[in-house]
Amino acid sequence: GTTTERMLDDVATEFPRINDSIQGRRAAFGYHPRVAKRADLMFDGLIKYAFGDSSAKAVETWNAPAGWFVGEASFAPNETKRSEDDGFLVTFGTNAREQQSAAFVIDAKTMQLASTVHLPQRISLGFHSYWCPGF
């Protein structure tokens, strides 16, 4: 096959992810942390892009709570796997002012917050993650 490169839109993003179970095949959706407008390389939300044959468009956005910045999102597929975007995005977030951290779980289909897990210790911004299903 061939690989092509094109601009998705004029919003700055980094660390794009897809549902890892389709790695190596054409993805219908991608999930990108959005660079905050008032902070250098800090991410204030996630954007879901739908990839068409010749275009891509942002279809949904999840905004982190005010004062929080997040990192790269890992895709955790739903065991029923009805569609490529049937699963959850898991991203770590940090509120530096409050010295708090949390794991945010976002429904990948609707981009709505499903759960917040508050962590007992603050973690650094830029923390990467990878979803590993249990055995």
Q: Across the structure, where does each feature detected by a protein language model lie?
A:
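Beta-propeller domains
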Residues: G1-F135
